[in-house]
């Protein structure tokens, strides 16, 4: 298991994701946050839905995940928000930067 992760969540409201990003960055729980426009297709309440959404990706340390998750859930506009993470590895200096910028 890696020490570093990318956490992601989606929303139809960019301002919600920008607010979550700001809170997490100010609390130093993530080192970087990126918001992308996406098109999503998913099942919801028995219906197949096509939706324009935004994807928020954040880089952090795995030991900070529970704090990140709590802030996302406390500030999200969805009834059942996607909150997932993937282990990452990569360029040593970049990973060191994640360490330096998170608390």
Annotate each predicted stretch with a short phrase.
Residues 1-103:
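Positively charged, small/polar-rich N-terminal and surface patches that mediate targeting and assembly
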